[in-house]
Structure formats: structure tokens, C-alpha cells
Swiss-Prot record:
It comes from Lactococcus lactis subsp. cremoris (strain SK11). The gene is hisA. Gene3D superfamilies: Aldolase class I. PANTHER family: 1-(5-PHOSPHORIBOSYL)-5-[(5-PHOSPHORIBOSYLAMINO)METHYLIDENEAMINO] IMIDAZOLE-4-CARBOXAMIDE ISOMERASE. This is 1-(5-phosphoribosyl)-5-[(5-phosphoribosylamino)methylideneamino] imidazole-4-carboxamide isomerase. The keyword RNA-binding does not apply.
Amino acid sequence: MEIIPAIDLQNGEAVRLYKGDYDKKTVYSKNPLEIAQKFEQMGAKYLHLVDLDGAKLGQTRNLEIVRKIKDQTNLKIEIGGGIRNLDTVSLYLEQIGVERVILGTAAAEKPDFLKELLVKYGLSRIVVGVDIREGFVSTSGWLEKTTLPYLSFLKDLEKIGVKTVIVTDISKDGTLTGPNFELYDEISKETSLDVIVSGGVKDSSDIQRAADSDFYGIIVGKAYYEGKINLEKEFNHANKKNYPLS
């Protein structure tokens, strides 16, 4: 299992939202590159980036920051937020060279487009972000609640050929109250998808719980920024345990 630190980008800054609310944000740094470099120094291999402006508006707004992080670190980057057409996907994967892109709104609204990307780029480079609010999938930067029950949607993704999903319980995100492990256990039981846990991580016990359940990965954001988790210690522990993210 891989521990994946997160940087959420808005207006060129590293921020965190509370339960996906754009009006409830905390700015942690005006220099996201420095944070990424610090993650790498601590032992991170992967980095989870979210373009919050892109997620809300449907167009990339933090491109140069992503490019700088890619050029000035050796981190393997996954990026989501506003990736809704082939031009944006090719920009990230082919020009900037990130390892994988995360589709959210596009996956829910345009399954044929998702299939096209899976064929063109392969299963390892296309990840689907499934954001859940009150049992249903949310889109457009968590602002729009659909009528798609999350489990039905996940099973549809599996049928299409998706391999990896990042699942976020929006009610947990940014709360430091622990992930909704009942949700993740259910998904693992009902599908064969590789599940990355996201939202609500509070301390190292959540990382251990995810590892014990053999989840594919876990994303750590606010818990690090608020000093609840020593990531360097966690990376060292994970390396000794040999939990690689393939």
C-alpha cells in the first residue's frame, strides 16, 4: 500500500477545504512546489494533486505549478480537477508527463470518453475519482449531487475496465475524524477495484487500518498539515513493510 500525500491547489496556493466547501478553506502555503519537495525529502514516491479551480470551473488553472513540481521533483504525480476532455488529458500525460490523471465529472457524465481514454493510455494511467455525498456520486468539484448510487456507479466502472478508483466520502473530507472504512470495506467486498482511501484521515492508526485491509493506497492531506501525522516516519515504516504501489 502506498501513502500518498496531497496538495490541493487554488489560485496558485496550497489549500484544504472542509467537507468540500469552497467557502471553508485554509491556506497552508503560497508555494506548493516547496511542499512537494519536502514530501519527496521525507520519502514520498507519489503525489496527489487536485486543481480545485479546475474542478469547479472545468478548466485547468494551476498548470504551471503542476509543471514546476513535475520538472523539479522525481515524484510520480497523479492529478485531478477539471479534466473533462482529451486535450487536457494529453496535456497532462504527454506534455507535462504526469504518471496518471484522475477523472471525476467526465467519468460520471461521459462513459464512452472514459472507455476511449482507457484504450488510448492504458489502465494504469487513467484513475477515476468517485466522490460520494449521502450515498450518491457528486461531480463538478463536489458542487453537484447526481442521482447515481455510488455502488452501482463503481460496478459500472468495473465493467468498463477501470482498475483503480480514489473514493472520497465528502462528509469526512477535511474533518480529521477518520475515513469511512465501512464504505471502503463494502466496495472491496462488492468489486475487485483497487481502492485508494481518501478523506478524513486523522492519524497513523488510519494508515495502519488501510494497510491491514490491503487497500491499494491512502491519501493524506490535512492530517499532515495540522501536525497529526509524521509522514517521514510513516514512509519509513511503509518501506520496511514493503507496500509498493504498482
